[in-house]
């Protein structure tokens, strides 16, 4: 998939709110090393740096456009284009932040234990994933994709996000690998100025798997 930092940042305040809440819950007073995986344009990395200004932080993302924006935003932090699923840090870390990225990576039954294993003893994995596949907007994406001239092109688009599990599944998965597991669910409400604004919001994230395979004329028809 291709990602646009400019599109993503049209709703920067709204997109950053969940990561502010997440980073505030990290139960560590002092952090020496941290990684922001799936850092996007650096807004989440900035929140992490504000919490731990003395830490050595790196940011990783699969999108060159996102990394370019992150480097411009935070030139003193090292950002790299990387495949999160294949990433191997040089040494164990105090904190791994994964904000709104793991839903795009399959195999959570092995991915999460592998991420925890990259931490120092007493380290923290702070992960946030959207739970919105049953929302009207996401159901409509799948319906429109399967009912139009683009159906063949988009037959796999809805599966771009990995299988969603319930909170207790993640608790049972993480518990053997961590002495403390804290899981919660929050609903964020974002008042937007009508249907077009909702489309603009979704073009930054959820619509990417549906728009990328289409020609420009098809994209306009799909969004209409």
State the predicted function of each range.
Residues 3-4, 177, 181-224:
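C-terminal helical/coil "lid" or tail adjacent to the Rossmann-like core of SAM-dependent
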Residues 14-32, 47:
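Conserved alpha-helix/loop element of class I SAM-dependent methyltransferases that forms part
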Residues 33-37, 41-87:
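Class I SAM-dependent methyltransferase SAM/SAH-binding core
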Residues 1-13:
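Class I SAM-dependent methyltransferase Rossmann-like catalytic core
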Residues 95-109, 131:
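A short SAM/SAH-binding and catalytic strip from SAM-dependent methyltransferases
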Residues 105-106, 119-121:
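Helix-to-beta-strand junctions that scaffold the AdoMet/dcAdoMet cofactor pocket
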Residues 88-96:
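A short acidic, Gly/Pro-enriched loop at the edge of an enzyme's catalytic core
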Residues 109, 116, 124-193, 215:
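Conserved catalytic/acceptor-binding region of the Class I
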């Amino acid at each position: 998939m291709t990602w646009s930092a400019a599109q993503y940042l049209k709703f920067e305040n709204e997109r950053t709110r969940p990561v502010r809440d997440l980073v505030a819950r990290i139960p560590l007073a002092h952090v020496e090393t941290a990684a922001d995986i799936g850092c996007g344009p650096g807004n989440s990395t900035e929140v992490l740096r504000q919490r731990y200004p003395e830490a050595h932080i790196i940011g990783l993302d699969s999108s060159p456009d996102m990394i370019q924006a992150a480097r411009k935003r935070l030139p003193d932090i090292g950002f790299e284009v990387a495949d999160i699923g294949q990433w191997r840090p040089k040494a164990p870390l105090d904190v791994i932040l994964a904000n709104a990225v793991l839903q795009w990576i399959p195999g959570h039954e092995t991915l999460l234990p592998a991420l925890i294993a990259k931490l120092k003893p007493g380290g923290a994995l702070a992960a946030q994933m959207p739970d919105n596949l049953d929302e009207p907007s996401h159901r409509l994406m799948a319906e429109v994709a399967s009912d139009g001239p683009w159906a063949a092109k988009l037959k796999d688009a809805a599966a771009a996000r990995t299988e969603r599990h319930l909170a207790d599944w993640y608790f049972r998965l993480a518990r053997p690998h961590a002495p403390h597991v804290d899981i919660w669910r929050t609903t964020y409400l974002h008042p937007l100025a009508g249907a077009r604004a909702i489309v603009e919001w979704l073009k930054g994230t959820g619509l990417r798997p549906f728009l990328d395979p289409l020609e420009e004329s098809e994209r306009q028809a799909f969004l209409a």
